[in-house]
Every structure is written in C-alpha cells, then in structure tokens.
Amino acid sequence: VHYLEKSAAAENIYPESALELANHNKHNPDIAISYYKLYAKHKPSQRTMSYNKIENILFDNQQYDEVENLYRELLENSFDGFALNRLVDILLEKNEVTDANDLVDRFMKSNHACHSIRLNKLKLESESFEVRKSISSLCNEMIKDEIIK
C-alpha cells in the first residue's frame, strides 16, 4: 500500500495505483472517492467507470445530493458529456426541468461539438419517460466508446 500511495502522489502518477488504492480504501468512502477521481483524471478513457463507482459509494452512504454535486463540479472545470448526461438525468428525477434546460442551453451556446449536448436537448423536449431513458442509455453507450484526447 505504501508504494501505491507513493505512486499516486507522484507528479506523473501511474493511474492503476489510484484505482488499487480506491479499491483498498472502500471502507473509507471519502478516501476511495478521492482516488477514483484521481484515476478518472489520469485515465480519462476509464472515467465513466470511476464516476459510476463514486455514484455507488455515495448512494450506499445515502449522500444523494453529493452525486449531483460531483457532476456539477466536473462540468464547472471542463465539459464532459457523461457528466452532462448524468446531471440532466438527476435534475429530471428531481423535476427540475428548467435547471436541466438551462444547463444544456449553456453548453449548446459554448459550441462544444459533442453529441451528448444535442441528445440531451432532444431528451428534454420529450415528455415520455421511456424515450428519455432510451436517449440517456444511447448517450452513455456512445460516451463509453469514445476516446478522450
């Protein structure tokens, strides 16, 4: 564990060290979450897995508002199609449709050429729960297949 911690604290970290430490610290949610975030940052192609693990930890610990905060924080720092899709879903679950629309419109104006923005706009225009769910699933599958540069 000591060598993993040393590797995770290095300037050029080995991302797998952060993942191992997250798994090792699963009994301590805050530490595990910090390592999953570190892993996602340094291995973007695996970020959706990390975010899903973080969501599960937060739900297991009944920290539901923190799930929303996670995705808001990610979107403040930079654009992430997965974070946008999940945050829109969360806002819709809370029936905060205006906030969801404002969020999507903000990214539509920023000219990000990501399919998630347009698909989420389409999702918001639908009243059907099944259609919304299908669009969310489509977004997530497309995002899993993309490679971040």
PLM ranges: what are they?
Residues 16, 48-49, 82, 116:
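Start-of-helix register in tetratricopeptide repeats
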Residues 35, 83, 90, 104, ...:
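Generic L/I/V-rich hydrophobic alpha-helical segments across diverse proteins
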Residues 18-21, 53-54, 87, 118-123:
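Structural register within alpha-helical repeat arrays
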Residues 25-27, 60, 93-94, 127-128:
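Register position in tetratricopeptide repeats
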Residues 9-11, 15, 26-27, 51, ...:
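Alpha-helical solenoid scaffolds in eukaryotic macromolecular assemblies
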Residues 12, 44-45, 78-79, 112, ...:
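Short coil turns that delineate tetratricopeptide repeat
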Residues 1-7, 30-41, 64-75, 97-110, ...:
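Alpha-helical repeat scaffolds
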